[in-house]
């Protein structure tokens, strides 16, 4: 089911144009990544921070970002995949510091369209809410961060991407504000193989949808580098290419994807483990045979190297 969810998120519009930003060639370490992403908000309205679901390292990066002392000075809104729009009042009460029982809080993610997967039951998602709540406890009421659920939840017939974009337009962009958005990385790809585009209707990717009305406002970041158990049909990434091109040995590291040679690395190799397992031929990469490059897919990546265990979420 999780594979199918990822596949359904891959139907994105023709390549959306990234914002023209100047970033360090390398931002090593979690704190370095957080500092650079904070600076991005000076040049872009939305930072779309893609995650590998249930991975602790990705959780550490986003928590370091929201705990950075400059974050609430620049950003007042966060939109997340792991909360439903229907439970927004509950989430609001928790984030602002009210007493909310564990059972009540769990409804925030248990009422999402993906609740049956159990994916959001991983404690890293509740940890994120707790981190924002803690940050808010030290801020005056008029300077606090608000977290919005982006999943449509029960009774709402909108797609997940349509619901998220509606929240961002109404609560952030139309108010000339700024937001951090946290979703699975596939929702933020700027481009995808044409074979998938004709099957997905209006779900062309959150970034591509935003670019239609607000071009150049969104900065898309995706994770690269995991240890996967791959079927023989899938191209095994050679992360030594990344490692040789980097000066720093510290991981994770934020790398702009308009920088050579990273810009021209193929999506088939480095995003290829995203699988389509629905056809008669077994699991194959959704990028198999595609000429798309990482520079077409996103604006930057958080490179973690080959030693991070994807399934363990560490």
Label every PLM stretch briefly.
Residues 3-13:
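Bacterial N-terminal signal peptides
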Residues 16-314:
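Compositional signal for N-terminal targeting/processing segments
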